[in-house]
Structure formats: C-alpha cells, structure tokens
C-alpha cells in the first residue's frame, strides 16, 4: 500500500460499555447482546470500555512492557524462545525471527515468504501463565526477574486480571448463543493449562516512507488462532482491520483505556461461521498512510501493544458449540481435518516461528 491523498475511513467498529452491559436487564440487555452479536459477525471485533482490567493495571503493564524491551540484548537472549516453540511457547523473539501469514500451510512456501517479503520490524515476548506447570524446556523468567525485580509478580497480576475478563467475555458469548449454562465455554478454558497466553509487542521506530511504500513492515495480515483476543494498544496507532465488502484495510484508531476484543479462528469454527475471525495487520498510523500528515523520512515513533489470548483447553476437540449447528457466513480458513485445540495451536505456532532446518536460521 502506498500513501494516498484519498482518506480511508476508519473501520466502523462499535464501542461497547461492559459496565452498562453487565448492569442491564430485559430489552435493554437484549439490545446490547444483539449489538455484540452483529459486531462479531460483521467486523470480528469490538471496542470495549469500562472493562474489569483497571486503568492502573493497564498503565503498569505498558511500563513493564517497555522496561522489558529496553533490557540489553544479552538479557533478552537469555530467555529466547526455544527452536521447538510449538512445544514451548514462551520467550523473546527478535526482529525477523517470526513471520505472520494467512492460509499458508506449506513450510517451503513459508520459507520463500521469509526471503521475499519485507521483514516484520518488531520484537515480541511470548508469555505463558507464570503460575502454570509446563514441560521442561521453557526459558527461565527468573533471569528477567534478576534485572527487573517485581516482573514475575506483575505477570501473575496481569494474567489473573485478563483471565477474569476473559471469563466475562465467554459468559456473554454463551448468553448470545442462547445457552442455559453461561459457564459452558469457561469450563473448557482453564488457566495454567496453556489456555491463556499473552504476547507483548515492541514495534521498532522506522522511516514512515518505508512503511507507507510497503518496503518495510510491522505485522503482516493474519487472523489470530485463539478463541478471543483482547488487544490493548498504546496511543500511536497503526492497527488495521480488513473490510471484506470493499476489500481494503481500514484503520482501527486507539481509544485510551479501551481494549479491542477480536474473534479468533477457534471461535469462528466453534460458532460454525456465525462470527468471523478478524483479519488484521499493523502498519504506519493512518495520519501518515492516508494523507493526513506528511511523514517524509522522519522516524516513526515506537509502538507497543499488549495482547491476551483465550484458548480452548488443548485436549478439547474443535467443533461447533450448542446452538451453532447451522453453518454461518464465514469460513476464513478451511480445515480439512477434525483436530484438537492443541494440534491447531501447534500448527499455527510452528509456521510462525519454527524454521524448516537449522541451516536456514538467520
């Protein structure tokens, strides 16, 4: 995509007030649920304000995020993500080590894309619940704690807060789908079972002109492979959502304190296509991309984001939820085989992070 003087309108993603929803009854509540249903069907995403993750916790998370990425390279390398990341999904990755893609399943094709596509100029820290028990092989986050005292305690706080909000999301899903047991999904979504995951992202500063011309990149277009994504942006911007009707990407501007709740691949499959897995990407802020402000060759400010993924328990089969027997509109990714949530996660993670052979690692 190139810079254009023609404005691109932001995605018409609705803003939902969760405090108001939880306090509502009767017809008012039915209308709120209808709006959520429509948003997840049409956009695959919704802004949420007045959620249960307090402003103080969110601001603290961004402080810790920046502190981590400001650490010396040697410290970050000490918790580098393992080569067999599909089995040990935790650790830091540097620029160019991962590649986001959509609908590409052939490892040879992924390697070709790595060589031909612009490098995603970002670092990431993949995090599992610090209270969980995992097979040997994960990086030891105590190595970070030695340089950032209090880091692990905050991670416990962060995961607990995000898990609580995720359960609220799942109860609303059950209510929209007409389930009697509003904890039906939550019972198959347990912490410390690799069902919760968080990614902290740092997008490097780079010339605006490179991003706008497509010669440089921040995050390729992709869907998320979870049930729900809870995304927290800083105020820099750059997130874009695919508009299927117009076949263009539209900006999703940050709203201070809000989170964006996106439908992932698993939930699209579980709702049998009723809701769409949100295809999205990260590029330059819209004021640079679409003619609002000439970026020139000035350095683009850095960007940080915090992401929390709710994932079905790994041993659960992926199949339609009760009430979703009738196929819906969406089929973002064709799945030929019935598989468990763990198999799906391993497949997507391996394509994003694992290299075909050790000799190809840059």
From Swiss-Prot:
The gene is lolO2. 2-oxoglutarate binds at residue 303. One of its GO terms (molecular function) is dioxygenase activity. Its EC number is 1.14.-.-. 2-oxoglutarate-dependent dioxygenase; part of the gene cluster that mediates the biosynthesis of loline alkaloids, potent insecticidal agents composed of a pyrrolizidine ring system and an uncommon ether bridge linking carbons 2 and 7. Lolines are structurally differentiated by the various modifications of the L-amino group and include norloline, loline, N-methylloline, N-acetylloline, N-acetylnorloline, and N-formylloline. It comes from the Eukaryota. GO terms for biological process: alkaloid metabolic process; small molecule biosynthetic process. Signal peptide: none annotated. Binds 1 Fe(2+) ion per subunit. This is 2-oxoglutarate-dependent dioxygenase lolO2. It comes from Epichloe uncinata (Endophyte fungus). Its cofactor is Fe(2+). Disruption phenotype: Leads to the accumulation of exo-1-acetamidopyrrolizidine but no lolines.
